[in-house]
Amino acid sequence: MENVLIIRYGEIMLKGDNKSFFEAKLTKHIRGAVKDLGDVKVYKMHSRVYIDVEDFNADEIIERVKKVFGVVCISPAVRFPVDFDVIKETALNQIKEEMAQRGVKTFKVESKRVDKKFPLKSPEMSREIGGYILENTEGLEVDVHNPEVRVYVEVRECSFVFTKKVYGFGGLPLGTNGKALLLLSGGIDSPVAGWLVAKRGVEIHGMHFHSYPFTSERAKEKVVDLAKILTTYCGRIKLYSVNLLAIQKEINEKCPEEEMTILSRRFMMKIAERVANKIGCDALVTGESIGQVASQTVKGLHVTNAAVELPVFRPLIAMDKVDIMDLARKIDTYETSILPFEDCCTVFLPKRPVTQPRLEKILRSEALLDVEGLIESAIGDMEVERISLDDE
């Protein structure tokens, strides 16, 4: 008998002639997630990925693999040659383990006969295995509707028996849908937005705007910490840090106070687009949500969009704040995001920011500034950092 992990994927199965491309990407990313653990054998067979875990910590591997986009669920299983007596005994042993560990009193057997040469059909297998379990245990009942534990039996080229399914995040393998630049602040929203877009197979890099020395070094470090958390899902990330202070001072000196936020936002988008084009990104990603703050009204978003030509992905656009917070907790960015450090949006914050900006009026104000010079200067002083999970 061998201990293996069965890794299943979902949407990849619908990719038709491109399926093998997506499968290869997924297998590559799974290998990458466990490569530092040693010579872990990862391989694809019959529209699944398998990992041999006989000599490894299966729980640690599961924790890593479930964060790989494209993985729907993982089952730690026992694999052995097809022998129905061994199948029954293995199923019984796994049920006894569940009874000892969790005190379960109800169960169900779910069988799947993939190898049609096997003489018993799936329902017959389930009945015989269930009967064998009942004969050899006490205080256990069958519950086909809501069992405390399910015993899964599969007969393929060999037999698999397991009781657990650990769910991943699904989605598509990273790098199968282009590349995007995430405007990464230190808040709750933007890391979640980046994670959601990455889940659809988009490679993510980050751009952070700060107003140092009006904002602190620790505020910048917080963003690096968020980027490191994202690397557990997204792999290595390039983080571009841009000081917006000179631009904010110019806006504060020459433009109406209430337009500070929307004008600053347009500069951020212009700078992000300029860098995105240079590094081969096909889109920008932001954590904006309709009505959440003054610059995120529909008119505000229209004025912001008008600053760039690249598509802007806003995966949080219709989400409530509480739902965004729940997802941030799920992906482990929440506790870092709520650390009380200032960001560039708090510098020169207007008392009454415009909530219904008109594009033509904003363009007139923008014409008072040396837009091109300010952008070039900001990009010229930009810092680039390569972030990976291994960074200390």
Swiss-Prot record:
It comes from Alkaliphilus metalliredigens (strain QYMF). It is found in: Cytoplasm. PROSITE patterns: THUMP. It catalyses: [ThiI sulfur-carrier protein]-S-sulfanyl-L-cysteine + a uridine in tRNA + 2 reduced [2Fe-2S]-[ferredoxin] + ATP + H(+) = [ThiI sulfur-carrier protein]-L-cysteine + a 4-thiouridine in tRNA + 2 oxidized [2Fe-2S]-[ferredoxin] + AMP + diphosphate; [ThiS sulfur-carrier protein]-C-terminal Gly-Gly-AMP + S-sulfanyl-L-cysteinyl-[cysteine desulfurase] + AH2 = [ThiS sulfur-carrier protein]-C-terminal-Gly-aminoethanethioate + L-cysteinyl-[cysteine desulfurase] + A + AMP + 2 H(+). The gene is thiI. Belongs to the ThiI family. It comes from the Bacteria. Catalyzes the ATP-dependent transfer of a sulfur to tRNA to produce 4-thiouridine in position 8 of tRNAs, which functions as a near-UV photosensor. Also catalyzes the transfer of sulfur to the sulfur carrier protein ThiS, forming ThiS-thiocarboxylate. This is a step in the synthesis of thiazole, in the thiamine biosynthesis pathway. The sulfur is donated as persulfide by IscS. Residues 59-166 form the THUMP domain. ATP binds at L183, L184, H208, F209, R265, G287, Q296. It holds the Pfam family THUMP. This is Probable tRNA sulfurtransferase. Gene3D superfamilies: 3.30.2130.30, HUPs. SUPFAM superfamilies: Adenine nucleotide alpha hydrolases-like, THUMP domain-like. PANTHER family: TRNA SULFURTRANSFERASE (PTHR43209:SF1). GO terms for biological process: thiamine biosynthetic process; thiamine diphosphate biosynthetic process; thiazole biosynthetic process; tRNA 4-thiouridine biosynthesis. Disulfide bonds: none annotated. The keyword tRNA-binding applies. CDD domains: PPase_ThiI, THUMP_ThiI.
